[in-house]
C-alpha cells in the first residue's frame, strides 16, 4: 500500500448545459451522421440508420462525448426496466390469482394473464385451479413475491406505481446528465471512486437493506403463511417494523434489541440468522433464515470491499499500482498498460463485464434448480424449466457479446505502438499456437464424444446391447463428478457448526424433499449417459470458444489479410480481385460464434429437461414411492443419438403437436410459426446478394412499366446485413420453437 499526499479536495466534475435540448434536431432521422442525415437515395439508408444509431464511436471520436452518451443511455435502459417491472407487478395486481395461489400454492397454478374473447382465444384461459381461468405463467414472480412478504394485490399495485415513478425519474436523469450537468471524462475514469460506490453502495448497502427487509418483513410474514394463517389476518409489513413486540412473539431475541450485537453475543440472533443448509420441508425452498444470514454476510464483505480503494484520502489501493505489480516469471511486463486500456476503451471494459456477467448468469441458472431460493419454486416444474432455459440463453448471448466487444476493442481502440511485451501483446504473438491447439482439442472432443454415441447406435442397431457403453454393459462412470458430489454430501457439520444438511440436496445423502405429493428435490444420480452428454457439452463449448477467440486474436491482422485493421470491424471480403477472403472480419466470427453458442446451449437445456423429468421430477405416494415423469428412462435412452430423437424430441413433442383445441394451443401455433421463422432465416443464409439484386432489378422494371417506381432506389441487403438478418431469425425461430416445445410439454405433464 502506498501512502501519498492527499489529492486537492474539490474538483469540478461536471459541465453545465453542454448540449441544448432540441426536439427539432431529434425529429430528423440520422441527425447523428452527416451522410445519413441527407436522407435516403436507396433502401440501404434505413439499414445504415439502424446499424449506426447506437454506434456512438461512429458519431464522434471524442471519448468524453461518447462516455456521456453511454451514461445517459444507461438511464434510459433503467427506465425501460422499471417500466417492465411495473407492468409485471401491475399484472399481478390486476389480472392474477396471486391471493388464491398464496392460500394453496401446491394445487393452484400461478396465472397473471387473462385472454379477452375476440375470435375465440378465450380457449387459452386454462383452469389453473381454485376456479380461476387464465394462462399459466412460468416467470417465478409469484414465488419471489411470497418470499419478499407480499400478501395482497394492493401491495402489488403500490409497488407497480412506485416502479413507474422510478421509471420517470430515470428518464429525467438520463436527460439531466447529458443536457444539464454532464460529467467530465475524469469522472468516468475515476475507477477507485466508482469501485467504492458500487461495492459499498450498490452491493453492500443493497444487500444490507434486503437482509433488513427479510428479517423485519419477509421472515415473520412467511412464518405465518407456512403455519397456514390466512393472508388477510397477517399484520401488515409496517406493523412488524414499528412494533418490536410483534416480532418478539415470533423471535424472542428481538425483545433484546441491539444489545446482543454490541455485546458481541451474536448467537442470540441465531433464531432468524441460521446456517442450516438443505431445504425447508414446508415450501421446498431454501430456508429464508439462511438467505437473510447470507445477505447480511455478503453486505459486510462488500461494505469492507468498498473501503479498500484510494480516493481523496491518501490511503488504500490504487488500481493502476495493483495492475502494474501483477507480473509472473513468464509474463513479461504482465498487466502494465491494462489500466490505460480499461479507462480509455469502453469496449474493452464492456467485454470484460459481459464475460463475467455471462458466466455468472449461467451459474445462476444452475443454482436456481440445485438450491431453489423461493418458496414453492422447486415444485413448479414449468417455472423451474423456464428459469433454467432463460438464464442459459442469456448467459450464452452475453458471452458472445464479450467476444464481439473484445474484437471491436482490438480493431478500434488497440494501439500496438505503445503495447510491448505485456500480457496482451504476448498472447497476440503466440496466437497461432493457441488457436491451432484449441482446434486440435475441438477435433479430438468432436470425434470422441460423437464416436461414443455412434458406437452405441451401431451396437444397438445390430442388436448387441452387451457391447454398448451404458450403466448395464460397458460402464463409463463420471468418477470425478461422483467424487465431488460425495464430498459435498458428507460436508455438513465440517463446513459450519450447526449445519444440518449439505448446500444442495442434489449432491446426495439420500434425503428427499417433497411438497404436496410432488418431488421438490432429491439426490441426482450421475452415470454413463451423463458422462457421454457432458463430453458433447465440452465439445460445443470449445468450438464456440475457438470461433470467438480466433475472431478476437485475428481481428487486426492475419497471414491472409495483414492489414485487416484498416478494413474495420465488419466487412464482407477483402475487396475485388482477392478471392477466398470472405467471412474473415471480426464481425463474421461473432456471426458464426452465435450458431455454435446456440448448439451448445440447446444441448444443455435438452440434457437438463430430460434428466430432471427422468430422475428428479415426479410424484410421491403415501408409501414413499417416487414415480418420475418419464420413469427414469434417461440412463438407457440418451446413450444413443436415436434415443435422443425418439425418446426425447419425438416422444415429448406429442404435447405441443396435439395441443390444438386445448388451452395449450397457443404453444402449438408458436411451435409451427417459430419453425417457419427459423426456415425463413435459411433464405438469407444460403443465397448470395447478387441473386436478390438480380430479382430486384426485374421487379423495378415492372414498377417502371406501370409508372409506380419509388423515388428511393431498392437495393438488396449487403452481404453483412443479409447475414445479420439470417442469424437473427435463426436464433429467434430456434429459441421460440424450443420455448413452445418445453412449455407445452411441462405444463401438460408437470
Curated annotation (Swiss-Prot):
Entry binding sites for phylloquinone: 692
GO annotation terms (biological process): photosynthesis
Broad class of the protein's primary localization: plastid
UniProt-annotated location(s): Plastid, Chloroplast thylakoid membrane
Broad class of enzyme this protein falls into: oxidoreductase
Binding-site residues, chlorophyll a: 683, 691
One GO CC annotation: chloroplast thylakoid membrane
Reaction equation(s) it catalyzes: reduced [plastocyanin] + hnu + oxidized [2Fe-2S]-[ferredoxin] = oxidized [plastocyanin] + reduced [2Fe-2S]-[ferredoxin]
Cofactor binding notes: P700 is a chlorophyll a/chlorophyll a' dimer, A0 is one or more chlorophyll a, A1 is one or both phylloquinones and FX is a shared 4Fe-4S iron-sulfur center.
Binding site for chlorophyll a': 675
Keyword annotations: 4Fe-4S, Chlorophyll, Chloroplast, Chromophore, Electron transport, Iron, Iron-sulfur, Magnesium, Membrane, Metal-binding, Oxidoreductase, Photosynthesis, Photosystem I, Plastid, Thylakoid, Transmembrane, Transmembrane helix, Transport
Membrane spanning stretches: 70-93, 156-179, 195-219, 291-309, 346-369, 385-411, 433-455, 531-549, 589-610, 664-686, 724-744
EC number annotated for this UniProt entry: 1.97.1.12
One example GO MF annotation: electron transfer activity
Positions bound to [4Fe-4S] cluster: 573, 582
The keyword Thylakoid is annotated on this UniProt entry: yes
Subunit structure: The PsaA/B heterodimer binds the P700 chlorophyll special pair and subsequent electron acceptors. PSI consists of a core antenna complex that captures photons, and an electron transfer chain that converts photonic excitation into a charge separation. The eukaryotic PSI reaction center is composed of at least 11 subunits.
Family recorded in the similarity comment: Belongs to the PsaA/PsaB family.
Protein name as catalogued: Photosystem I P700 chlorophyll a apoprotein A1
Gene (UniProt): psaA
Amino acid at each position: 500500500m502506498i501512502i501519498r499526499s492527499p489529492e486537492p479536495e474539490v474538483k469540478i466534475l461536471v459541465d453545465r448545459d453542454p448540449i441544448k435540448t432540441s426536439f427539432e434536431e431529434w425529429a430528423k432521422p440520422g441527425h447523428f451522421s452527416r451522410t445519413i442525415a441527407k436522407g435516403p437515395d436507396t433502401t440501404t439508408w434505413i439499414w445504415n440508420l439502424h446499424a449506426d444509431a447506437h454506434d456512438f464511436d461512429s458519431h464522434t471520436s471524442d471519448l468524453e462525448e461518447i462516455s456521456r452518451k453511454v451514461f445517459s443511455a444507461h438511464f434510459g435502459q433503467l427506465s425501460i426496466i422499471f417500466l417492465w417491472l411495473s407492468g409485471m407487478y401491475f399484472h399481478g395486481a390486476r389480472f392474477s390469482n396471486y391471493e388464491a395461489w398464496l392460500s394453496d400454492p401446491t394445487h393452484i397454478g400461478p396465472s397473471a394473464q387473462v385472454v379477452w374473447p375476440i375470435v375465440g382465444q378465450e380457449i387459452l384461459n386454462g383452469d389453473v385451479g381454485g376456479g380461476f381461468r387464465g394462462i399459466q405463467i412460468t416467470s417465478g414472480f409469484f414465488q419471489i413475491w411470497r418470499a419478499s412478504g407480499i400478501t395482497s394485490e394492493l401491495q402489488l399495485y403500490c409497488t407497480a406505481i412506485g416502479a413507474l415513478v422510478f421509471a420517470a425519474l430515470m428518464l429525467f436523469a438520463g436527460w439531466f446528465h447529458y443536457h444539464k450537468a454532464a460529467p467530465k471524462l475524469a469522472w468516468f475514469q475515476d475507477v477507485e471512486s466508482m469501485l467504492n460506490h458500487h461495492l459499498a453502495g450498490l452491493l453492500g448497502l443493497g444487500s444490507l437493506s434486503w437482509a433488513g427487509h427479510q428479517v423485519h418483513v419477509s421472515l415473520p410474514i412467511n412464518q405465518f403463511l407456512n403455519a397456514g394463517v390466512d393472508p388477510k389476518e397477517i399484520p401488515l409489513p409496517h406493523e412488524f417494523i414499528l412494533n418490536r413486540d410483534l416480532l418478539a412473539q415470533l423471535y424472542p431475541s428481538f425483545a433484546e434489541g441491539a444489545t446482543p450485537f454490541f455485546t458481541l453475543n451474536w448467537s442470540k440472533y441465531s433464531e432468524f440468522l441460521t446456517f442450516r443448509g438443505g431445504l425447508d420441508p414446508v415450501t421446498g425452498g431454501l430456508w429464508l433464515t439462511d438467505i437473510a444470514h447470507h445477505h447480511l454476510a455478503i453486505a459486510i464483505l462488500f461494505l469492507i470491499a468498498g473501503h479498500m480503494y484510494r480516493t481523496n484520502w491518501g490511503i488504500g489501493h490504487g488500481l493502476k499500482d495493483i495492475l502494474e505489480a501483477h507480473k509472473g516469471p513468464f509474463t513479461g511486463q504482465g498487466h502494465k498498460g491494462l489500466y490505460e486500456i480499461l479507462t480509455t476503451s469502453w469496449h474493452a471494459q464492456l467485454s470484460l463485464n459481459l464475460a463475467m456477467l455471462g458466466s455468472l448468469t449461467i451459474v445462476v441458472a444452475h443454482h436456481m434448480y440445485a438450491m431453489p431460493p423461493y418458496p414453492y419454486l422447486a415444485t413448479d416444474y414449468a417455472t423451474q424449466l423456464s428459469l433454467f432455459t432463460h438464464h442459459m440463453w442469456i448467459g450464452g448471448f452475453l458471452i458472445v457479446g464479450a467476444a464481439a466487444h473484445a474484437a471491436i476493442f482490438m480493431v478500434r481502440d488497440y494501439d500496438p505502438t505503445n503495447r510491448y511485451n505485456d500480457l496482451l501483446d504476448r498472447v497476440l504473438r503466440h496466437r497461432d499456437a493457441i488457436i491451432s491447439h484449441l482446434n486440435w482439442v475441438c477435433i479430438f472432443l468432436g470425434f470422441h464424444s460423437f464416436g461414443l454415441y455412434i458406437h452405441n447406435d451401431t451396437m444397438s442397431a445390430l442388436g448387441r446391447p452387451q457391447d454398448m457403453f451404458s450403466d448395464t454393459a460397458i460402464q463409463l462412470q463420471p468418477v470425478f463428478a461422483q467424487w465431488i458430489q460425495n464430498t459435498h454430501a458428507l460436508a455438513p457439520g465440517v463446513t459450519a457448526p450447526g449445519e444440518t444438511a449439505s448446500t444442495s440436496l442434489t449432491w446426495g445423502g439420500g434425503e428427499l424433499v417433497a411438497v404436496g405429493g410432488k418431488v421438490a428435490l432429491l439426490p441426482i444420480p450421475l452415470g454413463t449417459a451423463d458422462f457421454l452428454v457432458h463430453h458433447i457439452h465440452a465439445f460445443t463449448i470449445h468450438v464456440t470458444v475457438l470461433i470467438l477467440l480466433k475472431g478476437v486474436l485475428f481481428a487486426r491482422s492475419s497471414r491472409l489479410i495483414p492489414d485487416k485493421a484498416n478494413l474495420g470491424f465488419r466487412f464482407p471480403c477483402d475487396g475485388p480481385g482477392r478471392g477466398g477472403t470472405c467471412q474473415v472480419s471480426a464481425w463474421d466470427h461473432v456471426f458464426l460464434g452465435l450458431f455454435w453458442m446456440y448448439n451448445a446451449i440447446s444441448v444443455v437445456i435438452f440434457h437438463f429437461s430430460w434428466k430432471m423429468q427422468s430422475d428428479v421430477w415426479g410424484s410421491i405416494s403415501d408409501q414413499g414411492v417416487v414415480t418420475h415423469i418419464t420413469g427414469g428412462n434417461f440412463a438407457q435412452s440418451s446413450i444413443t443419438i436415436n434415443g435422443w430423437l425418439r425418446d426425447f424430441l419425438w416422444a415429448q413433442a406429442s404435447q405441443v403437436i396435439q395441443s390444438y383445441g386445448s388451452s395449450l394451443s397457443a404453444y402449438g401455433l408458436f411451435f409451427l410459426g417459430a419453425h417457419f421463422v427459423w426456415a425463413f432465416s435459411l433464405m438469407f443464409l444460403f443465397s448470395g446478394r447478387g441473386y436478390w439484386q438480380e430479382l430486384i432489378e426485374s421487379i423495378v422494371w415492372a414498377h417502371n412499366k406501370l409508372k409506380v417506381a419509388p423515388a428511393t432506389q431498392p437495393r438488396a441487403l449487403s452481404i453483412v446485413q443479409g447475414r445479420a438478418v439470417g442469424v437473427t431469425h435463426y436464433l429467434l425461430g430456434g429459441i421460440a420453437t424450443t420455448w413452445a416445445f418445453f412449455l407445452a410439454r411441462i405444463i401438460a405433464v408437470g
